[in-house]
Design a protein with these regions (language model features):
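Active-site helix/loop module of the DD-peptidase/beta-lactamase fold
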Residues: 78-116, 138, 167-204
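Short, basic/aromatic recognition patches
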Residues: 7-26
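A short, well-structured edge-of-sheet supersecondary motif
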Residues: 22-53, 83
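Short, Lys/Arg-enriched N-terminal segments with co-localized hydrophobic residues
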Residues: 1-5
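Glycine/charged-rich beta-loop-alpha catalytic/anionic-binding loops adjacent to active sites
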Residues: 47-56, 137-145, 194-197
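Active-site SXXK
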Residues: 41, 59-84, 111, 159-163
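Catalytic nucleophile serine of serine hydrolases
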Residues: 62-63, 150-153
């Protein structure tokens, strides 16, 4: 609690403190690509580790999940979806002949919270023949949605597919148009696609 109430001047980080912080990370063998520290809206420290550098694009992996959630939030704000909508209603083309009740019950909100009806990621990232979105609906459910948290990349991937289906454009292009461009987000950025052309909204 001692940190509360301190003035901005008292909280200024020194170069020595930042260097010491980096040394601790390196000593603990944290796999680093780069270290950037900002204070009061300004970048005050940066260090890169080969082969990474300031001007080299880096894959952000699961950070992409946050962008997918943002896009879903914007669609809800626009009135195009409700978080209580059932995800099956948007992908009838991928549904099995008999839809399991737990799958039919699953909502967009369940997926955002990673409380789907699966206890595993449903797609095989090494497969070039099984559609990653389709596999989400073809996999046998393991439990009722909303009852169990399970960190899952496939739910974010399907939500990204939903964004692209409803907007008719790549998810990152949609986000750039709606808000990212206004805050100076990199125009060079892109999201890797799965073998079937859907942006990898959970790991790209």
């Amino acid at each position: 609690m001692g940190g509360y109430g301190m003035t901005d001047k008292m909280r200024e980080l020194t170069d020595g403190q930042m260097q010491e912080f980096v040394k601790v990370l390196e000593k603990r063998r944290v796999p680093l690509h780069s270290v950037l520290i900002a204070q009061h809206g300004k970048l005050i420290f940066e260090k890169y580790y080969a082969p990474y550098c300031r001007n080299k694009l880096q894959r952000m992996f699961s950070v992409t999940k946050g962008f997918t959630s943002l896009a879903i939030g914007l669609l809800e704000q626009e009135g195009k979806i409700s978080l209580q909508d059932h995800i099956c209603d948007y992908f009838p083309e991928y549904l099995p002949g008999r839809v399991h009740p737990w799958l039919a019950e699953m909502t967009i909100e369940n997926m955002l919270k990673m409380q789907t009806c699966y206890n595993m990621t449903t797609y095989n990232k090494t497969s070039t023949t099984e559609n990653w979105v389709r596999s989400f609906f073809q996999t046998e459910p393991t439990h009722r949605p909303g009852t169990l948290f399970m960190y899952d990349t496939s739910s974010s991937h399907v939500l990204c597919a939903l964004v692209e289906k409803l907007t008719g454009e790549k998810m990152l292009d949609y986000l750039k148009e709606k808000m990212l461009r206004q805050i100076g987000f990199s125009e060079e950025s892109y999201i890797i696609e799965d073998p079937f052309g859907t942006s990898m909204g959970g790991s790209g």
